[in-house]
């Protein structure tokens, strides 16, 4: 970048922000560390609990960019949430490149369940939603917390990437097909009604038609409530870039991706259709010309389905309402307020 942009006076990496502050002639104040300027609607916020990643997935450049995993101190996270509640935030998306690693570096133990409990105990916290879990060595003691605490959403975003054992090995995922099935079955058994969101990849070097067909069978079998997918990209510096050839043609990758998403669209339509006639607690995000737009506890902002609410009753964005679902499409619900 320095060679390509000689007009730039100074570059700062994401970890040397103290140097930036120093160069600006300001001193760092610890008491300001958790103050936030919200860039989201005022009723929800993203709270990062860790930075970096210690995993060695073949295709991923995040560890190269962010470095080793660093858990934020638990007290710092709790203080940030308290401050956000004081600003009127009700819903918290707890995020990290790898939520499930939280605490292993700082506390020498998996501390995510404890952190979620502590945030859950804060008055004014209405919803907690978790992004992004890692499947291997998942902290199973998180599941009772999700099941028993009303303000912890029955929702888990956990990127699985693939199901074929040969692909999982080539991707360096440190989990098997059998272990993946066991994890998902246990989640659904221990947290009734949980909605699972996952991310899958097609076109990784070495993926055969048989591997792809196995992935399709897996998606049809598990029937994820929410799913995203993408085609493999040969990123410089990754293990895959150094050790594998990007041999699958781009058009094959795209065909596989399109087919996978068509399969999921049918599943999503069925999942949403099953909600017709049911009543859900919904938070209203915004008002549009013909309807209000809200979400249930099973829907994260920006990536999941929304519920479009008729304007029979005036509603306030940021407030909760009981909404009955009256119609459904693959990626949207339609409802009316009961209260």
Report each predicted region and the residues it spans.
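Extended hydrophobic-aromatic, low-complexity segments
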Residues: 154-155, 168-169, 192-195, 210-212, ...
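Conserved, mostly hydrophobic/aromatic
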Residues: 57, 77, 94, 130, ...
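Conserved SAM/AdoMet-binding glycine-rich loop
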Residues: 6, 86-212, 220-221
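Short flexible coil/turn linkers enriched for glycine and charged/polar residues
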Residues: 39-43, 53-55, 152, 162, ...
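Terminal RNA-binding accessory module
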Residues: 240-339
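Proteins enriched for Cys/Gly/acidic motifs involved in redox and nucleic-acid/cofactor modification
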Residues: 1-102, 156, 178-185, 189, ...
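Active-site proximal loops enriched in glycine and acidic residues that flank catalytic Cys/His/Asp
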Residues: 96, 132, 160-162, 198-202, ...
């Amino acid at each position: 970048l320095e060679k390509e942009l000689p007009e730039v006076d100074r570059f700062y990496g994401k970890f040397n922000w103290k140097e930036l502050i120093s160069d600006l002639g300001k001193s760092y104040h610890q008491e300001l560390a958790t103050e936030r300027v919200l860039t989201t609607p005022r009723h929800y916020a993203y709270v990062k609990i860790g930075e970096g990643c210690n995993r060695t997935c073949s295709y991923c450049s995040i560890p190269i960019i962010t470095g080793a995993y660093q858990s934020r101190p638990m007290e710092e996270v709790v203080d940030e949430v308290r401050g956000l509640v004081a600003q009127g935030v009700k819903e918290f998306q707890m995020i990290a490149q790898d939520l499930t690693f939280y605490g292993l570096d700082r506390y020498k133990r998996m501390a995510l369940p404890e952190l979620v409990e502590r945030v859950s105990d804060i008055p004014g916290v209405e919803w907690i939603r978790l992004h992004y879990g890692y499947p291997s060595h998942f902290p199973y003691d998180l599941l009772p917390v999700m099941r028993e605490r009303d303000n912890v959403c029955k929702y888990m975003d956990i990127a699985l990437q693939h199901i074929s054992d040969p692909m999982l090995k080539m991707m360096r995922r440190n989990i098997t097909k059998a272990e993946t099935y066991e994890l998902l079955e246990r989640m659904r058994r221990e947290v009734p009604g949980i909605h699972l969101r996952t991310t899958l990849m097609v076109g990784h070097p070495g993926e055969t038609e048989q591997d792809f067909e196995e992935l399709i069978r897996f998606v049809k079998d598990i029937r994820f409530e929410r799913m995203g997918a993408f085609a493999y990209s040969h990123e410089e510096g990754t293990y895959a870039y150094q050790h594998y050839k990007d041999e699958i043609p781009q058009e094959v990758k795209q065909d596989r991706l399109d087919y996978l998403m068509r399969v999921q669209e049918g599943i999503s339509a069925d999942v949403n259709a099953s909600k017709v006639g049911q009543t859900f607690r919904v938070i209203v995000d915004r008002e549009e010309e013909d309807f209000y737009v809200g979400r249930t506890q099973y829907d994260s902002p920006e990536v999941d389905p929304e519920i479009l609410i008729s304007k029979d009753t005036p509603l306030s964005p940021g407030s909760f309402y009981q909404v009955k679902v009256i119609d459904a499409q693959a990626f949207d619900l339609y409802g009316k307020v009961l209260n």
